[in-house]
Amino acid sequence: MNQRVTEFFLQYERANSSSDVSSSGDLYADTFRFGGPQGVHAVKKEDFLKVVPKMKSHLSSMGLVKTQLDTVETHPIDSKYLLVNVGWRITVRNSSGCRRVDAFATYVLFRGQDEELSIVFQIDHQDLASVIKSQQNTH
């Protein structure tokens, strides 16, 4: 299962780097929870798909160049759910060039029919926009 989960997040990485919003949406349940430093929200996939292009554009304009999968730790909760801690390596462009920064998120995945995985809960452990902004003045 660990290899399957790693493949899932490599697919997530590819979807995140492409302009094909629907491929990002394919990885999420129809309704999911999103948590971050400001709290937790229930999100409908259709609403999420409307926001993704604006979010990508905003982060790109701030200097986000690339997001790459770094680490994946999988912990089965039961036969249907997996807790996954993921490390991302993000590349941020600032006035002195590009800098790599680590970001972390925890996901709860649901294992559906045919072992298909979907994100039902995502917790970002930092506000990505704040992380990118903090790198703009770093040399």
Question: What do the predicted segments below correspond to?
Answer:
Residues 9-12, 16, 28, 48-55, ...:
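Hydrophobic alpha-helical core bundles mediating ligand binding, dimerization, or RNAP-core interactions
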Residues 35, 84-85, 120:
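Beta-strand residues in well-ordered beta-sheet regions across diverse protein folds
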Residues 48, 69-75, 88-90, 104-111:
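Hydrophobic/aromatic beta-strand elements that line small-molecule binding cavities or substrate pockets
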Residues 90-100:
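Short, cysteine-centered beta-strand-loop-beta hairpins and adjacent loop/turn segments enriched
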Residues 31, 85-92:
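Generic short beta-strand segments
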Residues 99-137:
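Short beta-strand edge/turn micro-motifs at domain boundaries
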Residues 1-30, 135-139:
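Short, low-complexity N-terminal intrinsically disordered segments enriched in polar/charged residues
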Residues 2, 21-74, 80:
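A solvent-exposed, acidic/Ser-Thr-rich amphipathic alpha-helical stretch
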